[in-house]
A protein has these predicted regions:
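Short, basic/aromatic beta-hairpin or loop at an interaction surface
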Residues: 81-90
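Envelope-exposed proteins and targeting segments
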Residues: 87, 119, 128, 271-273
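SH3/SH3-like beta-barrel superfamily modules
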Residues: 68, 102-135
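Cell-envelope/glycan interface and biosynthesis
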Residues: 140-401
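Sec-dependent signal peptide cleavage junction
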Residues: 22-40
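N-terminal Sec-pathway targeting helices
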Residues: 2-16
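Boundary regions of SH3-family modules and the immediately adjacent low-complexity/disordered segments
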Residues: 38-76, 124-160, 172, 183-184, ...
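Short alpha-helix capping/helix-loop boundary micro-motifs
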Residues: 94-100
Length: 402
């Protein structure tokens, strides 16, 4: 054992010498930034207090772009999307009901949505910005669910007919042009305003459709009160002159109000929509701002038992009327035997997403939850919508609620 001692002593000396050499190398390789960081640790406490009030620079690492938007209620973030006031809305300085009031937005006022905080949106109009309660606000569907097919025929060629006859002053007319160059999508697109809470259900229905090789085809969401009255008056006048038309909309058990509502309808409130269904022949993707979204490149619209907006009992879903707000009663009714399989599929998608069907029109669905939420506070649609105020979606604008 004594013979091994010189060897062990030598090994210890070599190890100590190596540690010293490594320490010297590390010291010499220290950067000025390291020295500065060390000195910052010695900053007096009062200077630390001054620094605490300073904002840290944005160190958010940029993701690989374009990216899929997977964390929100839509295909694209709401930041930058177009929105509209459906009623007179208070503009607050902060996102809370007791905040200072900046102004009021008139019904129909267009704005850009910038941020969401709880029950409020930060919005920007052409002249001001502030927070509004989004419960009463519309959002433009193409801005957040661009994969849906949109065809607002009332913008260029109204499909309204009754008993397959043209309705004077309506059929084939541009009754309500709702199309604009959409800065966000960088193309002309129809304007499809709908309540924010209802829009989330529409997105759900589109997801269900896409999973089964289909896509929604939306023809109309918001309809101005003035147009509603025009359709009603034209229908009544034609029915007075034509017995066939009268029988088609008033024969038992139906009445004209089942095809055109004489009162404020759910279209004016922003919680219903008219739509059809298409088979997707080719599905691809497209880039919008910093995001990738699905795009239906080719489709074939299904044939239903009547054309859309054929306002007569021929278009009925069930054998008799039932209140549109009845959540369960319609499930007990006899289905119109003329209903096609695609019409039944459309109903399945919409019902699973939270909508109620309308007994008299296969294309019309209501959001009863929104109706019960807003009650008499809902809008009456006494305005027109002609423009979009929006911007390209950017990843930096995403917040956890968007």
């Amino acid at each position: 054992m004594k013979r091994q001692k010189p060897f062990l002593n030598g090994l210890v000396i070599i190890l100590l010498f190596s540690i010293v050499i490594v320490s010297i190398v590390i010291y010499l390789q220290r950067s000025p930034a390291d020295d500065q960081a060390g000195r910052e640790d010695d900053v007096p406490s009062e200077q630390h207090e001054q620094n605490e009030g300073k904002e840290e620079p944005n160190t958010k690492e940029p993701p690989e772009l374009p990216m899929w938007y997977l964390d929100g209620p839509f295909e694209l973030p709401i930041a930058g999307a177009a929105g509209y006031a459906s009623v007179k809305q208070t503009l607050y300085e902060e996102p809370k009901a007791d905040a200072a009031i900046l102004s009021e937005l008139a019904p129909g006022t267009p704005f850009e949505i910038r941020e969401e905080s709880g029950d409020y949106w930060l919005v920007e109009t052409n002249s001001m910005s502030g927070w509004i309660e989004h419960r009463f606000a519309f959002i433009n569907l193409p801005d957040v669910v661009p994969s849906i097919l949109y065809n607002h025929t009332n913008s260029y060629d109204s499909r309204f007919k009754t008993s397959y006859l043209d309705i004077p002053e309506l059929t084939g007319k541009a009754l309500n042009p709702m199309i604009d160059f959409n800065e966000r999508l960088e193309e002309e697109e129809y304007i499809m305003p709908i309540l924010y809470q209802t829009a989330k259900k529409v997105f759900h229905a589109q997801q269900l459709a896409l999973q089964n090789g289909d896509s929604l085809v939306i023809y109309e969401t918001f309809r101005p009160r003035e147009l509603q009255l025009l359709v009603n008056e034209s229908m009544e006048k034609l029915a007075e002159e034509n017995e066939e038309v009268a029988e088609g909309i008033t024969g038992e058990p139906w009445s004209i109000t089942w095809f055109i509502n004489m009162n404020v309808s759910n279209h004016q409130r922003g919680l219903s929509l008219d739509l059809s269904l298409a088979e997707v022949n080719e599905l691809t993707d497209q880039t919008i701002g910093d995001f990738k979204v699905l795009k239906v490149k080719d489709h074939t619209e299904y044939t239903m038992h009547t054309p859309i907006h054929e306002l007569s009992a021929e278009s009925a879903v069930f054998d008799r009327p039932i209140a549109s707000a009845d959540r369960e009663g319609w499930k007990e009714l006899e289905v119109n035997p003329e209903m096609t399989e695609p019409a039944l599929k459309l109903q399945d998608y919409m019902v699973e997403a939270g909508f109620n069907p309308l007994a008299s029109e296969w294309w019309h669905f209501n959001d009863v939850d929104a109706l019960e939420d807003l009650k008499k506070e809902a809008g009456t649609g006494e305005f027109f919508i002609r423009e979009t105020v929006n911007s390209t979606p950017q990843w930096e604008d995403i917040t956890p609620t968007q």
